[in-house]
Amino acid sequence: ELFTGGARQFTVMGKDAKPDLAELATKIDVSGARGVHSVQPAVISISNLTELGARLSCADISAYSDLAKSRGMKLFMDGARFANAVAAGSDSPADLTWRSGVDAISFGATKNGAMAAEALIFFNPGESKLS
C-alpha cells in the first residue's frame, strides 16, 4: 500500500480458482463503500489458465468484463499461461482477450527462459499512456 497510494489487492475464491462473480461484486462494493475516504477499486485481474489449471471460457471472461464495466473498472489478464488456454480450446487469442472485454494483458517471458522480458498489451491504445 505504501508505494501505490493506498491501493490493495484482495483475493476472491471460487471453483477451480475462478473468482466467484457474486462474491467479487460484493467485495468491490464493500471496498468502495467509504467513497472518497478510501481507495476505489479500479481493476479486476484474472489469469487464464487459472492457478489451478482451469480454462476461462469467453463467456467467463465476458462476465468478469461486464462486472468490471458496470463498476467503472478495467479488466486485466495475466497471460503467464495464456498459450495453454489457447491450446486447450478452439477460441482464438482475440476471442479470449479483447473480444471478450479484456482491456490489457501481460506476458512475462521469464518463465520461459528469457531474462527480464515482459510485455504489456493495451487493447485501447489511448490507455497505454501514464497520466
Language-model features: where?
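Conserved PLP-enzyme active-site core in the AAT-like
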Residues: 1-131
